[in-house]
Amino acid sequence: MSFSGELCGRVAIVTGGARGIGSAITNALVARGAEVHVFDLTDTNESAGTLHRVNIADADSVAQAVASLPAPPTMLVNNAGITRDRSLLKMSDDEWRSVIDVNLSGAFHMLRACAPGMVAAGCGSIVNITSINGMRGKFGQANYSSAKAGMIGLTKTAARELGPKGVTVNAVAPGMVMTEMARALPPEVLDRALQESALRKLAAPEDIAAAVVFLLSDMARMITGEVIRVDSGQYI
């Protein structure tokens, strides 16, 4: 049996793939021959994928968007996410629900819409982008950490349910990643993240993309239900 990291001819969806980590993932997949459809709400696409304006928090919008694609995807990357940080006692219901709706319910909507096509094909690969904060919690992120922890549970449950159908489901848990948004943070925040890091450096978006490409490729065909941390040793 030959093993390859190339993804020629395969169809993928990357949510939140128009910029940042999502753009790096999209570009890495396109570079390896995949046809990538980006589901995002932005009008600005910084990736090499085909942009579709889709609100993943809305189940009907997701179902319609997936059904309208030229071919069913056999790869899905649930990357889209938002933050509405506030301490637990001050967090509003809207701040809680908006993050859960996009980060967790959105991933569920995507998985439910894409999995039937993968099951019919007898193969498929799904990667959920979670976070080390879903494993350890973080002050001011009760909503975000809960959603990311929920994605880990979703990953493991989907891996059990879809494994017999030939579909792998895994997660990648980044720590601090040096996106444009991260570079705009106060220096003391970045310094604290560096001090947490065993490698004394922080990941780039391309580091997350590399892990995703591996999990989507045939090289990871016997890996499912796993959470791979790409955090330069922030959480050990």
Regions found by a protein language model. Give the residues of each.
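Substrate-binding pocket helix/loop in short-chain dehydrogenase/reductase
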Residues: 87-88, 95-100, 182, 193
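C-terminal substrate-recognition "lid" of short-chain dehydrogenase/reductases
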Residues: 108-111, 201-230, 235
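Active-site helix of classical SDR
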Residues: 111, 147, 155
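Residue(s) in the substrate-gating loop at a strand-loop-helix junction
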Residues: 131
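Active-site loop immediately N-terminal to the catalytic Tyr-X3-Lys motif
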Residues: 89, 136-142, 164-165, 200, ...
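The beta1-alpha1 cofactor-binding region of Rossmann-like NAD(H)/NADP(H)-dependent oxidoreductases
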Residues: 54-64, 93, 206-207
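Alpha-helical segment proximal to the catalytic Tyr-Lys
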Residues: 116, 160-164, 221
